[in-house]
Amino acid sequence: PLNFSQFQLLKNTFQNNGGTSLKIFELPDGRIPSGECSKFIVELVNELKQYNAKAEIAVLAFNRDTIRFLQKEIFSKSSNTEDVLVETIDRIQGLTTAFCIFFIPTESIPFALQINRFNVATSRARLCTLLIADKDILHFTTISEEVSNYFKKILQIG
């Protein structure tokens, strides 16, 4: 098990035994996270680096607008960005990292839930994956059964 006892944000966000967690925000329409969500991602990267300065962290999203915004936020506000990758899903196939933060903007929900891309995004981390999305993701009607079951499993564990 992972010992997050000294790291309140990690303890409240990830499971002690690793795996996938879900964090819901009220997100604006479009591709950019809310101020609250953006601040959370930066704080999470900072705390992961305090937990393990050498941790490899991937922050993933679908489109370049989101990535550019997150890169600017993370690289200007995080104290340690060594081994922090902020990139699109399509550019990271084959990548493995310790922690993965997968941001799904409201506009990208249909795209994010396509099974092949969802699988790529949720299978990058050796330790923990965090999905960050709007509350509407849980009620998306065209979600595949496999992805729907994945969300149900995450919600039961969390």
Could you describe each region identified by the protein language model?
Residues 2-75, 85:
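Conserved helicase/translocase motor-coupling segment
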Residues 10-12, 17-24, 74-77, 111-158:
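Helicase C-terminal subdomain and adjacent C-terminal extension
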Residues 46, 87-89, 116-118:
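A generic local structural motif
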Residues 50-52, 92-95, 123:
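Conserved catalytic network of the ASCE P-loop NTPase/AAA+ motor domain
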Residues 64-66, 92, 106-108, 135-139:
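Conserved nucleotide-binding/hydrolysis micro-motifs of P-loop NTPases
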Residues 68-71, 95-98, 112:
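Extended hydrophobic-aromatic, low-complexity segments
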Residues 80-92:
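A short, well-structured beta->alpha microelement
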Residues 87, 95-107, 120, 127-132:
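A short beta-strand element within the Helicase C-terminal
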